[in-house]
Amino acid sequence: MALDQSLVGRSYPPTAPYEVGREKIREFAEAVGDANPAYTDAEAAKALGHPDVIAPPTFVFSITFKAAGQVIEDPQLGLDYSRVVHGDQKFSYARPVRAGDRLTVTSTIEAIKSMAGNDILDIRGEVHDEAGEHVVTAWTKLVARAAEEA
């Protein structure tokens, strides 16, 4: 079943604030094997001009993908998540994510395309801090593979 094209441009309500913790940043940096001291040492981050430790660039995927759940679970969209694979991910930063940030994400369906029987869904996640300042935009591309013929 094709995805509902009429939903292109639909935005979903902002998520509840997610508080970025130093420990979460450290765990993520270790998990991805990034030893940049700005991710684990507040003094190293301050020496680079940051008020506290900063997160690796892909850290926000964990909150933007969770926010994309509003899109994925929208029954009007018609997405069969059992057929979905992650196709692509991009980020555009206004500033680094920092420990202590309280971030919200607003997800928008940016595009729906069909190609070779597969549906391609592009979701844009706008991330803002509690002051309403833009921090990062994340684009997630999901591919709903065509159903296999019996």
UniProtKB/Swiss-Prot annotation:
Domain MaoC-like per the UniProt entry, residue ranges: 8-116
Pfam families: FAS1_DH_region (PF13452)
Biological processes per GO annotation: fatty acid biosynthetic process
GO molecular function annotations of the record: (3R)-hydroxyacyl-[acyl-carrier-protein] dehydratase activity
Superkingdom, natural source: Bacteria
InterPro entries, sorted: FAS1-like_DH_region, HadA-like, HotDog_dom_sf, UPF0336/Enoyl-CoA_hydratase
Protein family: Belongs to the UPF0336 family.
Protein name as it appears in the record: UPF0336 protein SCO4636
Organism: Streptomyces coelicolor (strain ATCC BAA-471 / A3(2) / M145)
